[in-house]
Amino acid sequence: MYKRQPKNKPEIVNVPKANYIAVRGKGNPNEEGGAYQQAISVLYAVAYTLKMSYKTDYKIEGFFEYVVPPLEGFWWQDDVVGVDYTNKSAFNWIFVIRLPDFISKADFNWAVETATKKKKLDCSSAEYLTIDEGLCVQIMHIGSFDNESATVALMDTYLDQNGYVNDINKDRLHHEIYMSDARKVAPEKWKTVIRHPIKKA
């Protein structure tokens, strides 16, 4: 589903429509036991229920074994252009995990119900979300999330030089794809794809 990782310099891409498991929330993602950590638990519970469905009596049409894709996040703050990393408590977010094309809404509903029962975890916050990102600029950011502003500045300069402008709004959001496990990798080595919606200037 993700054939290659972006380069550490800006590139323009046309992102096709895709389906995701999604959980929405608000607040500081670093809060111990907060909404973010609960959302991640729900996402992975549903994702792995779908991945391992072939070992159950439930059969998904067209299923083949696959690797669960990386975690992704869409971020925004009310009345703020871009993202202000100094005010993490004001974050609104949608965390997602991409689904293979063969997984239907009915399959998703089965997984939510099954994960809730088997893992004794309320997964009702999960939703089946279709996202059509379209024209975007993206780059591989290396390092802490708090240092993303310098990488975003590189993206904005690239857009200006190539006749594009940022198109972040209430429907098209700042997007991050987390290629590293933050629990196992030092912050200075974290790999995060940053993706912004764009349009012609």
Predicted regions and their residues:
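A solvent-exposed interaction/effector surface
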Residues: 3-201
